[in-house]
Amino acid sequence: HYGRLVPAAEIVRAPAAASRRSVRMAWEQIGLPAMVRSVRPDVVHSPHYTMPVLARVPVVVTLHDATFFTSPELHLRSKAEFFRAATRVAVRRAAGLVVPSQATRDEIVRLLGTDSARFTVAYHGVDHGRFHPVPPEEQARVRGTLDIGDLPYIGFLGTLEPRKNVPALVRAWVRASEGMDRPPALVLAGGRGWDTALDAAIAEVPRHLTVRMPGYLPLDDLPGFLAGATVLAYPSLGEGFGLPVLEAMACGATVLTTRELSLPEVGGDAVAYCGTSATAIAEALRELFAAPERRESLSVAAKERARTFTWAEAARHHLVAYEKAAARR
């Protein structure tokens, strides 16, 4: 998208570095500055917290969220320490800072005391060619891969890690299912993180309820999975943006999420909100299952709001950040 905005611009991609963090960081601090000296770009964009401190050109850094500071217990200790240090370096040395939400900007300004004018807010977009409403036949096809029969289901999409609050969702689903003639299944799609509390919550699920953890779903199955859920639940404790919420909205899902950090910026009035406790989530689930008209209304609103989030618009905001940084040379 940036290339289409500025056809005359030359975009140089750095080669993929090794998967080990130590090797990758060594390359970023030694190999990348050497590449910069050879290519002589106007701006370097580092898209994930860290930056080449020896680069002799303006560097723009993307900071995705501030939860490494505000909620370190939700991350592995080594990861939280590393990204806190990287964020401090970026705030101190970068020519420009890009964040995916106003909430992330405000948190970093509050925590590190930097000037908000240094930030450019660039909301993520969604690939509308992939994430869009699909017909019932496609929803049924995907349902057939989930091993839940013809049960309605509550869906979750994301990494199964503490920040996503999935154990509370499991307990909430069990409570919300009490008294239902036909309790919905719960399908937790995504890679496993390090959330041992989730294992304990799953172990306590009554035998008559159906829970599935299919891992990563094929990309082609995601629209059918999201659109086919009676409710797509995303009860996160905090996000820098919340891309699964936007992807679900684009597919016309009824989304239930929280008001933590950036999520209201994404959902607006097109999603349902709840607290982060199992009790609050359960109450919201019961209300949505009992109100098909509201679910339909939210689905319509979600599709409309999702259309306003595009990668072309995100690219335009990045261009602003690059121009501001280049002007500091």
Give residue ranges: language-model regions.
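Carbohydrate transferase catalytic cores enriched for Leloir-type hexosyltransferases
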Residues: 1-329
